[in-house]
Design a protein with these regions (language model features):
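Internal helical hairpin/lid segments
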Residues: 195-208
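Hydrophobic packing residues within well-ordered alpha-helices of enzyme cores
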Residues: 24, 46, 72, 98-99, ...
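Short Gly/Thr/Asp-enriched flexible loops that form oxyanion-binding sites at enzyme active sites
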Residues: 68-81
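ATP/NTP phosphate-donor binding region
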Residues: 1-63, 185
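Catalytic core of DAGKc-family lipid kinases
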Residues: 31, 40, 79-196
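Active-site glycine-centered loops adjacent to acidic/histidine catalytic or metal-binding residues
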Residues: 9, 66, 91
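Short amphipathic alpha-helical segments
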Residues: 18-20, 73-76, 100-102, 207-208
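Short, glycine/serine-rich, charged loops/turns that create anion-binding
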Residues: 11-12, 94, 200-201
Length: 208
């Protein structure tokens, strides 16, 4: 029997997982997993628990939004390479952009069924200053929308909450002076937005 640490963010997205949480856990147990559940207590809790408890488990699965997944990844990446566990993802956030890129269903039960049959595979992980990301790293206009949007708005409106918060950010548009080196070329200019994405959609908008 394999040991699973199941990290659950109860405040993610529209909190739809609570209606199927027991069914999701039942799927894991019936597929030979001994499940330990950790309910996140604050924004950084997923990162902390992933780092501190990895040695006790064979796999970590997180249920939440793209932010919850990012926190788990940041916790895992602080460990020596040999100690980093496979990470599974049950998407239940407001947009689930990264899950869409990996063709993971945004219905908890369907995602769990797919997860227990899946084989681990490698994904690209970005590194910016002291943070790691699998979804997106951005600066400038709209880049703080996901963090600035109140959680209660996301729970009620889902993707629409980001749209409303984005409209507010248009009022003040700062620019950033950058020197960019790529493909043996150098570009220098002022930019109002920049993004590195590991997803086919950002903020709920597809085909970026």
């Amino acid at each position: 029997m394999k040991k699973m640490l199941f990290v659950v963010n109860p405040k993610a997205g529209k909190t739809t997982l609570k209606n199927s949480l027991a069914d999701v856990i039942d799927i894991f147990i019936k597929n030979d997993y001994e499940v330990t559940i950790h309910i996140t207590q604050n924004a950084d809790d997923a990162s902390r628990i992933a780092k501190e408890r990895s040695m006790d488990f064979d796999v970590i699965v997180c249920a939440g939004g793209d932010g919850t997944l990012a926190n788990v990844i940041n916790g895992i990446m602080q460990l020596p390479k040999a100690d980093r566990l496979p990470v599974g993802y049950i998407p239940c956030g407001s947009t689930n952009d990264y899950a869409r890129s990996l063709d993971i269903p945004d219905v908890g039960i369907k995602a769990a069924r797919k997860l227990v049959k899946a084989q681990p595979f490698a994904v690209d992980i970005g590194h910016l200053t002291d943070k790691f990301f699998v979804y997106v790293a951005a600066f400038g206009i709209f880049s703080d929308v996901s963090y600035a949007t109140p959680q209660n708005m996301k729970n009620v409106l889902g993707h629409g909450a980001y749209v409303l918060q984005g409209i507010k950010s248009v009022i003040n548009i700062p620019s950033y002076h950058l020197v960019i080196e790529h493909d043996n070329e150098v570009e220098e200019d002022d930019f109002i937005y920049g993004m590195v994405s590991n997803s086919v959609s950002v903020g709920g908008y597809k085909s970026m």
